[in-house]
Amino acid sequence: MKSINIVECKNEDDLKEVAILAEKIWHEFFPGIISEAQIDYMVEQFQSFDAMQDQVKHQQYHYHKVYEGDELVGYIGLQNQPDCLFLSKLYLKDSARGKHYASEMFEYAKKQAEKYCYPSIYLTCNKYNKHSLAVYEKFGFQWIDSVQTDIGNDFIMDDHILEYRLNRI
């Protein structure tokens, strides 16, 4: 069974690679869940190089590249918050899905949460993204709330909020 290697982004070139991959992944995965116009808008607002650079510099985000061999196949975006770790982004290209890489990526996120002594990890996921919701539930996340967020340009993010409690003694 193949495995992945996860590497923290250290510079602008790393973030640029992630942003290019993000646009590809979003256009592979989200049609049928949200409109193409909303995909384009959300990529520009939240997944572009400029957005990621701002998140790293001003919002305590850190990004991690996911490799299968030498190929960049995914990325993770984490945000340090006062009381928990926010799993903002966990994405894989279509060719890397179904190989249990998401579970390896989640284990990596758990280690990051433990490193910062967080009691929990939370995330938001589109209510109509049934596959990802099922994966997160399998990982042990629990639904704690729902939220509709106006993100501008007449678009709404219609999400479930999920939480994973770390076993801490």
Question: Positions of the model-derived regions?
Answer:
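Basic/polar N-terminal segments that are highly enriched at the extreme N-terminus
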Residues: 1-3
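C-terminal "cap" of GNAT-fold acetyltransferases
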Residues: 119-122, 126-133, 137-139, 146-169
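Glycine-rich phosphate-binding loop
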Residues: 96-100, 152
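Substrate-recognition "cap/lid" segment bordering the active-site pocket of phosphatases
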Residues: 98, 107, 134
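Acetyl-CoA-dependent GNAT
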Residues: 6-15, 19-95, 106-108, 112, ...
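Short coil/turn segments at alpha/beta junctions that flank glycine-rich nucleotide-binding fingerprints
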Residues: 99, 116-119
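Residues forming the Rossmann-fold NAD(P)(H) cofactor-binding site
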Residues: 103
